[in-house]
Amino acid sequence: NQWQPSTDGVGSAENKISQTTIADLERVSNFLKEKYNYDPGAYQNFGNSAADNYKIMARIDWNISKNHKLMVRYNDVKSQDDNLVSGASTPGGVRLNNAGRNSINSISFANTGYKQENRVRSITAELNSVFSPKVSNKLLASFTNINDTRKTDGDLFPFVDIMRLGSDGKTYEGYMSFGTEIFSFNNGVLNNTFNITDNVTIGL
């Protein structure tokens, strides 16, 4: 998070200083810890860490015999990326009247963020067989597992936006946010795909 809270309530877009004060953030943090035993996380000097990813690839080629050849290939790709809370949207589709939950108007606590985790594992096997000069066969089988999920830091807690009256005296704008990111709990895509193809070639 590039935005930092202010000491005097004066924001600066150039210096990434929010109007949200350290005193207010500290007051809310202490209240949540004492009243609900909930730690909302840091409110400054936190942010997106570097994306973490790895790839594992392995392949085996086996000449079973002169007429039968087997290939097995395995791929495993995993990536993880830290993200700040969604900038302005709410479950009801209402948009906050500011530049986001981390902006010149507002600061969100660290535990409002989420981790996007994606893992794809697949295994493929191919068996090529020659039964006679005129008959051959290719058997293909594959299995793919896709796990695309979100994880949140901290304990589960209702997401809260603290609003305040804007400078125009008519509309409310975000000032502070804490709790579990509203679109991340139990949000995930799990897919398992299995394919088998058998091709027989007969020469005339």
What is the role of each PLM region?
Residues 1-6, 14:
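Glycine-rich (often Gly-Gly/Gly-Pro-rich) flexible segments and glycine-rich loop motifs
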Residues 42-45:
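Surface-exposed cleft-lining segments at the edges of enzyme active sites
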